[in-house]
């Protein structure tokens, strides 16, 4: 027995120095960003009282996420992702500190705010590609699912800051919240400079660089290679296509659900928070379960496909139910959603080589953004002529069909990615 124990490979610890730093840094910046972001939305509505200007405000933040990930992904496969992460956090700290100072003087200009949102949106787009490509490099072998279950819980807990943000905004105004966010970004940036992980992919990419090739030509070649890699990997392409449709339905849900609750129930926004709060509970519980319990490796593909279809059915039908049933369905949706997230991201990030992660994540994020924006626009137009619940059901039906076609229709290629020890 003792001899068998000696032969059994030791499981590497997840909570290494670098992983702890990146996780704590993410918590600090994520909570501060969630709080100030929602408060800024309230500020725009209070000052402009215009749905059109609010839509423009949202668009200026979202628009850079279509193009920026593609170019940043190619660049970040050749340069330090760690340096990019903490540099962008330092810049964000400066921007939010300046905004806090300006707004504390009572000065407000919507055009200036829109430009600032465009800059922040661009920074956020580049940051997300850098973070998503660097984070898996800090995870020890065999701990991908556990690490991403932690990430999903932290992202979910950021939603808790929304009611806190609302309360503080009404009590102290926007400037102190932006100041807090600046301090959060500064703290995260200082901590991230202490990460020691080596980025060996830089040397790998440098060795493949063509001598005498201009930076612009190399960038375009890297972008082509990124899409070529995605196109050549049948399983990754199927997953990316399905999640583009999932984002399409998610965009539709964003523009349908809150207006539906406000027009259907007295104090509908509070009913909305109650129902969707169960989604947060479900994702939190699900993330904690995934941290403790490992799914059977050989069944991850089957579980994922089932989850994709069931989520579409739940989201496509819950608005027809009484509020208590809605809450139960959203709880289930949260549990299943974190399962979907953990399986997909741990599988793909452990599968894609380090030197290609930036381009893959850039392409994946771009497809998701295009899907989300398309869903928002199309759903908004359809609700003018069709019942809102019917529109949401139609989008979710399309997503379920996409799961069957792309994920189910490419069983061998997708299962080869999902059913791996991570």
Regions of interest found by a model, annotated:
Residues 51-52, 141-151, 269, 354-364:
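Loop-to-transmembrane helix entry/capping segments in MFS-fold secondary transporters
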Residues 67-70, 78, 82-84, 88, ...:
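C-terminal transmembrane bundle of multi-pass solute transporters/carriers
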Residues 41-47, 100-105, 160-182, 263-264, ...:
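Transmembrane alpha-helix termini and helix-breaking/packing motifs in multi-pass membrane transporters
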Residues 106, 133, 137, 178-210, ...:
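Helix-loop junctions on the cytosolic side of multi-pass membrane transporters
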Residues 2-19, 198-240:
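Juxtamembrane intracellular "pre-TM" segments in multi-pass secondary transporters
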Residues 27, 108-126, 325-339:
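Hydrophobic core of transmembrane alpha-helices in multi-pass small-molecule transporters
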Residues 27, 39, 172-179, 222-287:
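A single, central transmembrane helix in multi-pass transporters
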Residues 116-159:
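Cytoplasmic helix-loop-helix junction between adjacent transmembrane helices
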């Amino acid at each position: 027995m003792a001899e068998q124990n000696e032969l059994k490979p030791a499981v590497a610890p997840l909570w290494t120095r670098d992983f702890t730093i990146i996780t704590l840094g993410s918590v600090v910046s994520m909570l501060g960003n969630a709080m100030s972001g929602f408060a800024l939305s309230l500020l725009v509505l209070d000052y402009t009282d215009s749905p059109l200007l609010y839509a423009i405000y949202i668009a200026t933040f979202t628009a850079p996420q279509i193009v920026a990930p593609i170019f940043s992904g190619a660049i970040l496969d050749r340069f330090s992702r760690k340096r990019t992460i903490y540099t962008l956090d330092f810049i964000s700290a400066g921007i939010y500190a300046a905004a806090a100072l300006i707004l504390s003087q009572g000065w407000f200009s919507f055009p200036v705010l829109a430009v600032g949102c465009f800059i922040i949106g661009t920074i956020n787009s580049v940051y997300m590609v850098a973070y998503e490509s660097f984070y898996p490099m800090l995870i020890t072998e065999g701990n991908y699912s556990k690490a991403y279950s932690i990430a999903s819980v932290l992202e979910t807990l950021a939603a808790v800051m929304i009611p806190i943000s609302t309360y503080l905004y009404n009590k102290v105004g926007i400037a102190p919240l932006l100041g807090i966010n600046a301090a959060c970004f500064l703290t995260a940036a200082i901590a991230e400079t202490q990460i020691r992980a080596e980025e060996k992919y830089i040397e790998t990419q440098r060795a493949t660089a063509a001598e005498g090739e201009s930076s612009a030509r190399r960038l375009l070649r890297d972008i082509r290679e990124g899409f070529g890699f995605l196109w050549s990997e049948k399983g990754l392409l199927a997953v990316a296509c399905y999640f583009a449709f999932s984002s399409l339905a998610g965009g539709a849900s964003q523009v349908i659900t809150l207006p539906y609750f406000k027009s259907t129930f007295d104090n509908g926004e509070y009913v909305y928070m109650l129902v969707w709060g169960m989604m947060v509970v479900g994702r939190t519980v699900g993330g904690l379960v995934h941290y403790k319990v490992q799914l059977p490796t050989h069944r991850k593909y089957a579980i994922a496909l089932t989850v994709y279809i069931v989520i579409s059915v739940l989201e496509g039908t819950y608005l027809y139910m009484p509020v208590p049933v809605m809450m139960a369905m959203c709880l289930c949706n949260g549990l299943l959603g974190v399962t979907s997230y953990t399986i997909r991201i741990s599988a793909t990030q452990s599968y894609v080589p380090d030197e290609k992660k930036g381009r893959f994540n850039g392409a994946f994020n771009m497809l998701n953004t295009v899907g989300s924006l398309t869903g928002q626009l199309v759903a908004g137009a359809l609700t003018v002529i069709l019942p809102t619940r019917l529109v949401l059901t139609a989008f979710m039906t399309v997503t379920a069909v996409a799961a069957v076609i792309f994920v189910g229709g490419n069983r061998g290629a997708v299962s080869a990615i999902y059913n791996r020890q991570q």
